[in-house]
Structures are given as structure tokens and as C-alpha cells.
């Protein structure tokens, strides 16, 4: 029945010999004379566990307010000191957006 349901496109190539390749379950009886013991060998793949990421206790780390840093860029402690020095002061003789928009090369020819 498995041969009829197997789909090469979805499931890939068929195993070499039926379900024995997918699940191996062997049971052997060992005779020690007076007592009979049942020996069982099972090889079924186990499900891997999800790895756990180590975390710092919440009391030990500083919680940053993401929205405050997005809407108030100067409040970000990592970039607070460079904001005014780098982003707010352009270099001398740097063209502005208006210079670029209204120059002869980039001005729209459609009138």
C-alpha cells in the first residue's frame, strides 16, 4: 500500500526496502538455560530538542524603550553624542536638496 501512496515529487525517492529503512524494530529471545529473557533492540530516530538561548535576568539588564529611540533619535544613548556633530552640520559648500532640485541639469523639461 505504501508503494501506491508514495509520491516522488513530494516525498522524494522511495526507500530501498520498504518500511525497514524508515523504522527498525528487532526482537530477539535469548535462552540462558533455566530462564528466558527478552532482549529488544529499537532504533527509532529521536526528535531533536529546541536549543535554549541563555538569558540575563531582567533585573540585571537595562530595558531600552525602542519607540523612544525611533521617534526621538537624540535620546539613544549610543548615538547621542555623534548626532549633533555629524548629522546636523553639513560640510561647507555642500549642495542642499534645493540646489539639486532646481539646478539646470536636474530640472524638469516638461512645462
Swiss-Prot record:
Induction summary: Strongly down-regulated in axillary buds within 6 hours after decapitation and then up-regulated.
Keywords on record: Developmental protein
Tissues/organs with expression: Expressed in axilary buds and in non-growing stems and roots. Detected in sepals, stamens and carpels, but barely detected in petals or leaflets.
InterPro entries listed in its UniProt record: DRM/ARP (IPR008406)
Segments of skewed composition (Low complexity): 41-59
Pfam families: Auxin_repressed (PF05564)
Region (Disordered): 30-60
Family: Belongs to the DRM1/ARP family.
Protein known as: Dormancy-associated protein 1
Gene giving rise to this polypeptide: DRM1
Amino acid at each position: 500500500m505504501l508503494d501506491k501512496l508514495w509520491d516522488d515529487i513530494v516525498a522524494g525517492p522511495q526507500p530501498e526496502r520498504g518500511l525497514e529503512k524508515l523504522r527498525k524494530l528487532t526482537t530477539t529471545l535469548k535462552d540462558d538455560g533455566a530462564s528466558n529473557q527478552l532482549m529488544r533492540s529499537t532504533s527509532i530516530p529521536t526528535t531533536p530538542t529546541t536549543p535554549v538561548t541563555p538569558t540575563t535576568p531582567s533585573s540585571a539588564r537595562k530595558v531600552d524603550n525602542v519607540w523612544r529611540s525611533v521617534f526621538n533619535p537624540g535620546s539613544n544613548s549610543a548615538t547621542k553624542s555623534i548626532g549633533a556633530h555629524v548629522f546636523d552640520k553639513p560640510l561647507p559648500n555642500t549642495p542642499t536638496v534645493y540646489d539639486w532640485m532646481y539646478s539646470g541639469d536636474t530640472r524638469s523639461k516638461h512645462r
